[in-house]
Amino acid sequence: MESQSIFDAKSFLKQLTTRPGVYRMMDARGEVLYVGKARNLKNRVSSYFRNTGVSIKTRALVEKIADIEITITHSETEALLLEQNLIKTLKPPYNILLRDDKSYPYIYLSSHDEYPSLTFRRVRQKKTGKGRFFGPYTSAAAVRESLALLQKIFRIRQCEDSFFSNRSRPCLQHQIGRCSAPCVGLIDPQSYAEDMSHATMFLEGRNPEIINETIQQMEVASAQLDFERAAVLRDQVDYLRRVQEQQAIEGVARDIDAFALSSSLELVVVHGLFIRAGRVVGSKSFYLSERLESDDGDLLSSFLNQYYFGEHAIYGLPQEITTTVGLTDKDALKAAFKEVFNRNVRIEHNVRSNRAEWLHLAQTNANQALSTRMQSQDAQLQRWQSFCDALNLEASVKRVECFDVSHTFGEATVASCVVFGPEGAIKDLYRRYNIKDVPAGDDYHAMEQALTRRYSKLKDSDVGLPDIILIDGGKGQLGIAHQVFDELQITGVTLIGVAKGVTRKPGMETLFISADNSILNLPGDSTALHLIQQIRDEAHRFAITGHRNQRNKKRTQSVLDAVPGIGPKRRRDLLNYFGSVRNIERASLEEIKRVPGISEVIAQTIYAAFHE
C-alpha cells in the first residue's frame, strides 16, 4: 500500500538531477529527519518512494516527509564528507535507524593537561571524549599519512595515555626522531605546547602562520644559545615549506565561501558553499522573497552584509569569498571585515581553477534550489486551491488559523494558534496562550479561553479576522468556538472541526463545517486533506513545544523555589555547580555541602526537600 505523505514526490523527482550529492529530508515543521548521500541523486531518492520492497522503518520516514533539500557535489567522496558534517551538525533522528554501520576516520587531539597526543580514531555520529576531532578524512590511509607527517615535523606523541604514564625511558619513536619524549621529561611543557599549537594550526591549514611563528622561535632559541632547539625548529621550517610548495602544486584550497545567485520574477535564491581546508563542510540556500535592489551586485552585497555581520555565518569568516557577480561595494565590505574582525578577506568574482569549480557548483545548487522552491510554491498553491474547492469556498480565502491544546494530565496547559496563507505558514502571526484558572484537563474551557483571548483583540486590530478557523476536535470543540463567536458578536468566519477517525490514523479525519452544518470525509489521497493535516500537525507541534517548555520551567521552579533559604543567588550557584535540577536531586548530602555559599544547615534543607 502506498504511504500517505503530504510531499509531492512525483513532481519533485521529475526535475531532480542525476548528479552526485547530499539530500536532506524534512518534516512539516522544517526539522531534518534524515541526511543521505548518493552517487545518483535521482535514483537514490526515488528508491524511498517505491510501492514495494520498502522496509517498515523507511515507510515510517516517508510518511513524515514534507520537503527535501539537495546539495550537488563534484563527487561521491565529497558527498560522503558533506553528509558526515551535516549529520554531526543536525543530528537527524532517522540517521540512527537507517544509516549503515560505517564509521569515519579522524585525527583525535586528546585532552591531556601537559602533553596531549594525536591519534587515529574511527567514530560514528556521536564522538566521545573531551578532546578535539579533525576530519572526517576520505580514508584511513589519509589519516595515517597526516599523522606520519605530523610526527616527522612536530614530534608529537601518538601513544595511548596508559603507555605514556608508565615509561621510564624513551621509546623507539624518540630514537628515530619522531617523538620529543615528553614521557621522561626530555621536553618542557611550554615547548611541547608550542609544537602542539603548530600541529593544530597545520591541521587547520594555517601553514604560513606556523612558518612565521617558528622562524621567530628559532631566532629566539639561537639568541639564547639553545642551538639544539634552534636546529629542530629549522628542520620544521624546511619541512613546512616543502609541504606548502606541494600543496600549491596540487591546488589545495584555502578557507573559501562561494556564493551564487539565481532568481526569477518573484524569488531570489543565494546559495552558499562553505569550503574549509579544501573540503566542502556545508552548504545552505537562502530565499529572498522581496527584491528591493535591481542589480544582482547590489543584492548580493546587501545579502553578504547581513550574513556576516548578523551572526548568520555558522562557519565563521573565511580567508576568501568568491561570488558569481561583482559586488558594488566590495571595498567597503573588505574595510568592514578589517574594522570589525581585524581580518583581511579576499573578495573575487573572476576566478579560475579550483575556485571556479566551487563557484560553478554553488551556481548549480542555487539553480536547483530555485527550481525546487518554485515547484514547491506551485504545489502549495495547488493544495490551497484544492482545499477551497473541496469545501466549496471562494477563491478569495487568504488566511486560515488553527488551534490545538496540549497538557500532561492537566499540568501546564498551553493552547496554540498557527496561521497559514496560500503560500504556506505565516509564522509571524503564530501565538501561544498559557491557560489559567480552568479545571485540570478540561480541553473545552482551555479552548474557550484561547479563542476569547485571541479574537477579542483581533476583531478590532489591523490584522483583521481570518477567513477560516480549524479546531482540532469534533463537534464539542466546534460548539465551544460557536459560543465564543456569538459572545464576541463575530460573523463571517467559517469554523471547521477536524476530528480524527476511530483508528486515529491520518487519512481518516472527519470535517464538521459550521457554514452549512455539513459533515465531510475527504479521500486519503486528497491534496486538500493533506493541507489540512499539515496545518493541524503544525498547530499540534507548536502547542506541545510550548507545553513542554512551561512544564519544565514549572517543575524546575517548584522544587528549588520552595526550599526555605534559597534565593535567586543560591539557586543560580546550585544550578551552575550541578548543571541541572535533576543532578541536584541525585546529589548526596556531602556533594551539596561542597557548593560554595551553601552551609551545612542549608544543604540538609535542600537534600530533605528532594528526598522526604
Swiss-Prot record:
Residues in UVR domain copies: 208-243
This protein's GO CC annotations: cytoplasm; excinuclease repair complex
Gene Ontology biological process terms in this record: nucleotide-excision repair; SOS response
Entry-linked InterPro entries: GIY-YIG_endonuc (IPR000305), GIY-YIG_endonuc_sf (IPR035901), GIY-YIG_UvrC_Cho (IPR047296), Hlx-hairpin-Hlx_DNA-bd_motif (IPR003583), RuvA_2-like (IPR010994), UVR_dom (IPR001943), UVR_dom_sf (IPR036876), UvrABC_protein_C (IPR050066)
An annotated Gene Ontology molecular function: excinuclease ABC activity
Keywords annotated in UniProt: Cytoplasm, DNA damage, DNA excision, DNA repair, Excision nuclease, SOS response
Limits of the GIY-YIG domain: 18-96
Family stated for the protein in its record: Belongs to the UvrC family.
Keyword match Repeat: no
Family matches, as SMART domains: GIYc (SM00465), HhH1 (SM00278)
Chief location: cytoplasm
Pfam families linked to this entry: GIY-YIG, HHH_5, UVR, UvrC_RNaseH, UvrC_RNaseH_dom
Domain of life: Bacteria
Compartment(s) of residence: Cytoplasm
Native source species: Hahella chejuensis (strain KCTC 2396)
Record-given protein name: UvrABC system protein C
Protein function: The UvrABC repair system catalyzes the recognition and processing of DNA lesions. UvrC both incises the 5' and 3' sides of the lesion. The N-terminal half is responsible for the 3' incision and the C-terminal half is responsible for the 5' incision.
Oligomer and partners: Interacts with UvrB in an incision complex.
